A protein has these predicted regions:
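Flexible, glycine-rich terminal cap/loop adjacent to redox cofactors
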Residues: 10-39, 44, 51, 55-65, ...
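Hydrophobic Val/Ile/Leu positions in short beta-strands of Rossmann-like dinucleotide-binding domains
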Residues: 14, 35, 179-181, 187, ...
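Glycine-rich dinucleotide-binding loop and its adjacent helix/turn
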Residues: 50, 145-200, 204, 232, ...
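Glycine-rich flavin
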Residues: 2-10, 17-18, 23-31, 36-174, ...
Length: 461
């Protein structure tokens, strides 16, 4: 290979600097480590995903609270949105500094055993990588390259500027109007962000229902709220054109939608398809995920994978948990620890917030459980009165015979916080029949909605 350097060998090679970057703890100080990152240090979550989006969500929440203040007897309004100020606060003052600091640390004197390569990595043989002009081999290789937005047609081949979550937050100016394509959590969060900040939002989805994976009670209520809040169009795009003022989208339903900008949030795909994995004997699932066993091992001995590139759960807290398992397994090959894939929660930072863990009611019935179900309204507890909440619910699904909590589903203020105590109940297999009365619940605080939901479950005599 002309121009190639001789192979450099390392004890450990890590591809990707999201969760994978947390593997080199002090226990690895005696190991030679290569970190390969073609993009920005920190991965999706830090740079273009969960963290900056929630910083935008919080600003939108505050703006929306002012809009809805009349129900509390207040007259409030947002005079203006300083888009440049938000971008500077989120990225220049926070995210970019953290990403830059992370790279400087890995390249610096504090980690002399680590070498950083800033090129795209691909396999050219078993446990052998090419990154730019460098050939890199390793005793162990960890693939933690994450995922990327999916752009279906006609967006993928269009010359019209199409935005994804990876650039929408860094727009030079806030659009007066925005088309959001998609019906999943990314689409719904950004629809909330831009509508909350005053952009006119049109949501385009190919099916009638948003967030279809949710329990039916939450899904139906959220869809009612979304349809009241956003201009919703159902259909699949047949044409995308650039106009003098922005974009024009034509749907197979005949609808034509125009806006200053368009965001496509129709899903994500694992970043394993451009790494020539087959040259190393690494197999993939049909959906593009790298095949791993319960310990994170791929089909090539000594090669591991974690996070979005291999996991069925595209969630940062899952990637972090998988990273801890792989980290342990690298250090203790005689005592392998499985990936922790039980009781995985998820939250959606829309308005209202949504959080869920475990089985939906339909799933529990399909699995043959004799279920007991309670749907508790936020508006029926004291703090719900204080907020004048009329949409929030806490739904619990339990096994009537054993008191085992099978699923918890919350939609309303602070849902992502309220769900945590129910995750604990499931992880430690607590008898939910004793859960409400074996502890104090602060009155009149919002967790009383969970207490009342538990007390409302009906049990076998």
């Amino acid at each position: 290979m002309v121009g190639m350097t001789s192979a450099q060998h390392f004890d450990l090679v890590i591809i990707g600097t999201g969760s994978g970057n947390s593997i080199p703890s002090p226990e690895f100080d005696d190991k030679s480590i290569a970190i390969i990152e073609k993009g920005t240090f920190g991965g999706t979550c830090l740079n273009v995903g969960c963290i900056p989006t929630k910083m935008y969500v919080y600003a939108a929440d505050v703006a929306l609270a002012a809009r809805e203040a009349t129900r509390l007897g207040l007259s409030a309004h947002v005079d203006a949105v300083d888009w440049d100020g938000i971008v500077e606060r989120v990225f220049h003052n926070r995210i970019d500094q953290i990403a830059r600091g992370g790279e400087e640390y890995r390249r610096g004197e504090e980690t002399p055993n680590i070498t950083v390569f800033d090129q795209h990595a691909r396999f050219i043989g078993p446990k052998t990588l090419q990154a730019g002009d460098d050939i890199i081999t390793g005793d162990n290789i960890v693939i933690a390259t994450g995922s990327s937005p999916v752009l279906p047609e006609p967006y993928a081949s269009s010359s019209v500027p199409v935005h994804t979550n990876e650039d929408i937050m860094r727009l030079e100016k806030q659009p007066r109007s925005l088309i959001v394509v998609g019906g999943g959590y990314i689409a719904m969060e950004f629809a909330h962000v831009f509508d909350g900040l005053g952009t006119e939002v049109t949501v385009v989805n190919r099916s009638e229902k948003f967030l279809r994976f949710l329990d039916e009670d939450l899904s139906s209520r959220f869809n009612d709220i979304a349809r009241e809040r956003f201009d919703v169009r159902i259909g699949t795009a047949t044409a995308l054109e650039e106009t003098a003022d922005g974009v024009r989208l034509t749907l197979d339903s005949g609808d034509v939608v125009e806006a200053e900008a368009i965001l496509v949030a129709t899903g994500r795909q694992p970043n394993g398809d451009q790494m020539d994995l087959s040259t190393s004997g690494i197999e993939m699932h049909e959906d593009g995920r790298i095949k791993v066993d319960e310990f994170g091992r791929t089909t090539c001995e000594g090669v591991w994978a974690l996070g979005d590139v291999s996991s069925p759960y595209m969630l940062k807290h899952v990637a972090n948990a998988e990273q801890r398992a792989v980290q342990h397994n690298l250090l203790h090959p005689e005592d392998l620890r499985p990936m922790p894939h039980e009781h995985i929660p998820a939250a959606i930072f829309t308005h209202p917030q949504i959080a869920t863990v475990g089985l939906t009611e339909a799933q529990a019935r399909e699995e043959g459980y004799d279920v007991t179900v309670k749907v508790q309204n936020f508006g029926d507890v004291a703090y719900g009165w204080a907020m004048e909440d009329s949409t929030g619910i806490c739904k619990l699904v339990a096994d009537r015979a054993t008191g085992k909590l099978l699923g918890a589903h919350i939609m309303g203020p602070q849902a992502s916080t309220l769900i945590q105590q129910l995750i604990t109940a499931m992880v430690y297999d607590l008898d939910i029949r004793e859960f409400a009365r074996s502890q104090y619940w602060i009155h009149p605080a919002l967790p009383e909605v969970v207490e009342n939901a538990v007390l409302g479950l009906e049990w076998q005599e």
